[in-house]
Amino acid sequence: MKPRDLIARASAWIAELRAQLPLGRRGERAAEKFLRRNAYRIVARNFRAAGAEIDLVAMDGDTLVFVEVKTRRSRDAGAPEEAVDERKQKQIRRAAEIFATRYRADDVTMRFDVIAVDASGERLEIELLRNAF
């Protein structure tokens, strides 16, 4: 492959990622509003540790909830929640352990939820999957 072709491919890939980023942020904002309306208290956003990121950390009563938000424009690539595969779950669990240790929450009940945001229509559709993994 010629360097020029490689640069063109990389540029197209970067442009595609940039186009997706606002959708992801929009989904995270919608998920946060959804959680607040359902009496969750947000304690952290985009927590990064161990090479992973947890989109939202919230309290649901006395339970510390780590929330992964997945947003899709269409289901062509599968349902949003299907993107939270075993590898991603492992990364989130590792980051959650670090969060719990850092903020001395080791003795708190923890849960892992996924929020699937469907952006294929005029309005965002949000589905909460409690205890997703």
Q: How should these model regions be labeled?
A:
Residues 1-45:
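Acidic-basic catalytic patches of nuclease active cores, encompassing PD-(D/E)XK
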Residues 5, 102-133:
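Domain-level recognition of nuclease-like catalytic cores that cleave nucleotide substrates
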Residues 35, 54-78, 84-86, 92:
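Conserved catalytic cores of phosphodiester-cleaving nucleases, focusing on short active-site segments
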Residues 38-39, 50-54, 110:
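Short beta-strand or tight-loop elements
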Residues 45-48, 54, 114-118:
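Short, solvent-exposed loop/turn elements at beta->coil junctions and helix N-caps
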Residues 51, 62-66, 109, 126:
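Structural motif
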Residues 79-82, 94, 98-110:
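Non-DNA-binding regulatory cores of transcription-related proteins
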